[in-house]
């Protein structure tokens, strides 16, 4: 069996939580953590290696960009965090500069694996990661609407009493204010969502608003969101390293799906050892198609305005 190595850039709350989740859920041989604050990565490496007796042997170390050379995956969580009252798009200018300083040295190291991005605004930064790296589009992945979708399924579970494992519903579009729910195709416990009397139109509108605002509410209460997105990252890495063919709603490359080109946006996609092996284009109603087009247009406007 080949040696499995993950290179992590960003050791803040998302990065450190992801590192912990990864070691507990995926068998890897080496994890290298890179951050501008070297002292933190050194401390986390020492802390995380204590998991070995409980989860299995793994080399964990603080490193630099040269360590990305032989990694299977480069995970990017580094970036300015969203503060109360901010939208994810407010982070663009700052985080694009940070992203540029990360991608170049990773590519120069000889890295030939798969990029996985969670830094916000994730759809835009994933799009720019592909452009900056020149990597094939399937080799660049963003967490997209995987967290939004998890929040939607939790909310639907609360409303219906159905276990989240039996809820198949997606949030699509931007991981941000222009996201939307694909209610027409949603299935709850083998029945169409629309067949549930307790999920009338008014309730669904309230639920959609609650899902969209949940991240901001968490940030207002505790300063950041990190548990959910860290597990999203872990599941993506697991699918890549174990060739799982996992379907997740991700920042996926559009090559005509939904009428969108040259942009990463939230849509179900299949993750395998080769990265994104397929983008699943869901059937959308006329209204949902308009929402997807609007979401894409808003992000495309931002991307086109960035001078790389």
UniProtKB/Swiss-Prot annotation:
Gene Ontology biological process: glycolytic process; lactate metabolic process
Is the keyword Cytoplasm in the record?
yes
Name the enzyme's class. Answer: oxidoreductase
Alphabetized Pfam families for the sequence? Ldh_1_C, Ldh_1_N
Record keywords: Cytoplasm, NAD, Oxidoreductase
Residues holding substrate: 88, 120-123, 148-151, 225
What's a single GO CC term here? Answer: cytoplasm
Where on this chain does NAD(+) bind? 14, 35, 65, 79-80, 101, 143
Location in the cell: Cytoplasm
Catalytic reaction(s) noted: (S)-lactate + NAD(+) = pyruvate + NADH + H(+)
Q: Does the keyword Hydrolase apply?
A: no
Instruction: Give the Enzyme Commission number.
Output: 1.1.1.27
Q: Which family does it belong to?
A: Belongs to the LDH/MDH superfamily. LDH family.
Quote the function comment for this protein.
Answer: Catalyzes the conversion of lactate to pyruvate.
Describe, as the record does, how this protein assembles with itself and its partners: Homotetramer.
Q: What is this protein called?
A: L-lactate dehydrogenase 2
Q: Which organism is it from?
A: Lactobacillus johnsonii (strain CNCM I-12250 / La1 / NCC 533)
Coding gene?
ldh2
């Amino acid at each position: 069996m080949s040696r499995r190595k993950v290179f992590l850039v960003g050791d803040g709350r998302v990065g450190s939580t992801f590192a912990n989740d990864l070691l507990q859920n995926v068998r890897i041989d080496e994890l290298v953590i890179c951050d501008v604050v070297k002292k933190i990565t050194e401390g986390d490496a020492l802390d995380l290696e204590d998991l070995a007796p409980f989860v299995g042997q793994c080399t964990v170390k603080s490193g630099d960009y040269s360590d990305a050379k032989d990694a299977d995956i480069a995970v990017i969580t580094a970036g300015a965090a969203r503060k109360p009252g901010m939208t994810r798009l407010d982070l663009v200018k700052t985080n694009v500069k940070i992203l540029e300083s990360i991608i170049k040295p990773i590519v120069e190291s000889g890295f030939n694996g798969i990029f996985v991005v969670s830094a916000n605004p994730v759809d835009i930064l994933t799009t720019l990661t592909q452009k900056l790296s020149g990597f094939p589009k399937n080799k660049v992945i963003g967490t997209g609407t995987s967290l939004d979708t998890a929040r939607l399924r939790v909310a639907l579970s609360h409303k219906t009493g159905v276990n989240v494992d039996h809820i198949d519903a997606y949030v699509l579009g931007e991981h941000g204010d222009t996201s939307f729910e694909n209610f027409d195709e949603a299935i709850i416990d083998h029945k169409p969502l629309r067949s549930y009397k307790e999920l009338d139109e008014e309730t669904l509108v309230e639920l959609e608003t609650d899902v969209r605002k949940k991240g901001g509410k968490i940030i207002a209460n505790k300063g950041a969101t990190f548990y959910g997105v860290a597990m999203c990252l872990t599941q993506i890495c697991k699918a890549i390293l174990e060739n799982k063919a996992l379907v997740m709603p991700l920042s996926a490359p559009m090559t005509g799906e939904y009428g969108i080109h040259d942009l990463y946006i939230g849509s179900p996609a299949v993750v395998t050892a080769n990265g994104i092996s397929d983008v699943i284009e869901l059937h959308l109603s006329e209204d949902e198609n308009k929402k997807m087009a609007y979401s894409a247009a808003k992000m495309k406007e931002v991307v086109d305005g960035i001078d790389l």
